[in-house]
Amino acid sequence: MLMRTDPFRELDRFAEQVLGTSARPAVMPMDAWREGEEFVVEFDLPGIKADSLDIDIERNVVTVRAERPGVDPDREMLAAERPRGVFNRQLVLGENLDTERILASYQEGVLKLSIPVAERAKPRKISVDRGNNGHQTINKTAHEIIDA
């Protein structure tokens, strides 16, 4: 059996019951990386039900909200260390990402956002007019000039 030994944790629990909030900060840890032509973000949300997730985007700011319901007030808790309540996390995305085509999936407590790189941010070739000598094409990725 677990023993209660931390009086401050009991005060936190009491404050949560009375005020509806916890004195401990709620966290939503994440990893982010680029994978080929997309930007990937994964949030750890163990114990969160998929229907409590809410993802909004306004301009280039993505807001992720999730909720873990509080403990049944009739239950006498011996330990209550998992954060409860509403969690929020905002990401400011660069202009080089296509926010119109974001995909989201949720499996095994991990929310994954896949955000494609915008077409305007991808490398491309630009044709340069050389007057009477024809055109040259500049390959931005290889930094070379090709006679056309």
Swiss-Prot record:
Transmembrane segments: none
Domain sHSP: 21-131
Record PROSITE patterns: SHSP
Signal peptide: none
PANTHER family on file: HEAT-SHOCK PROTEIN 20 FAMILY MEMBER
Family that this chain belongs to: Belongs to the small heat shock protein (HSP20) family.
Purpose: Not known. This protein is one of the major immune reactive proteins in mycobacteria.
Protein name: 18 kDa antigen
Species per Swiss-Prot/TrEMBL record: Mycobacterium leprae (strain TN)
Gene name, Swiss-Prot/TrEMBL: hsp18
